[in-house]
Amino acid sequence: MNRGDLMEAFGVSVNQASTDLNRYVSVAPANIAYDKSARAYVRGPNFSPLFLTHDASRYLAQLRSVADGILDKADAWIGQLPEFDAAPTPVRGVDAKILRAVVAAIRRRESIEIKYQSLSRPEPRWRWIAPHAIGFDGFRWHTRAFCEIDQIFKDFVMSRIMETRGTRPRTSDPGSDVDWNEHVVLEIGPHPQLSETQQKVIALDYGMRAGKAKIKVRRAFLYYALNWSP
């Protein structure tokens, strides 16, 4: 890394790039060393992050966001992206107007009338819901809402909302949505019928300790968590 890299990445001047490099060297001298042959600063042998913690998931999430087209390469904080790709998944189309209307209803604490296509009915149906949150089950986006027809809190798949129209003040209290507000802890482990080697591999895959991993999940997401499979 040299001044030119900082100037390109952050759009700063030559003087500012020099100042930033010198400041970093002063606060973390063991993290960086100047390589005369490369005319650049390189990672020190005893490097230890000063401003960020070791978190592989953040790095990999950036790669996934770029692969999915959510994040432009120029906007990623990874300086040099490695060669990468991701297996495509079917697009779950959420209409921007629908999303905007639902989010507005959440912010304004309103009920909103939606035209919703459920799996249990052959034709879409207009209904009033009082959305208070948005959730993702790993594949689909939902809005968590009080259904004024069924008189219960439930999930509505965003891509199945075909239209919206009127709004009105909501009368339900999100605080009474027990399944959304309460969490449970799932304890998972390798299937006992797997071989010892296979169990060790599964434990590595999921970061298990002593053959177990604990996952905190909202009760509302319990069904999705239990039915998820890699």
Q: Which ranges hold each PLM region?
A:
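Conserved short hydrophobic interaction patches
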Residues: 24-27, 164, 228
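Bulky hydrophobic/aromatic content
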Residues: 43-117, 228
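Core beta-strand-centered patch of the WYL/Sm-like small regulatory domain
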Residues: 81-193, 197
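Polybasic (Lys/Arg-rich)
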Residues: 181-230
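A generic structural signal for beta-strand entry/edge sites
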Residues: 38-40, 140, 212
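Short, basic/aromatic recognition patches that contact phosphate-bearing ligands
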Residues: 1-53, 188
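Conserved aromatic-histidine-acidic binding/catalytic patches
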Residues: 8-9, 90, 213
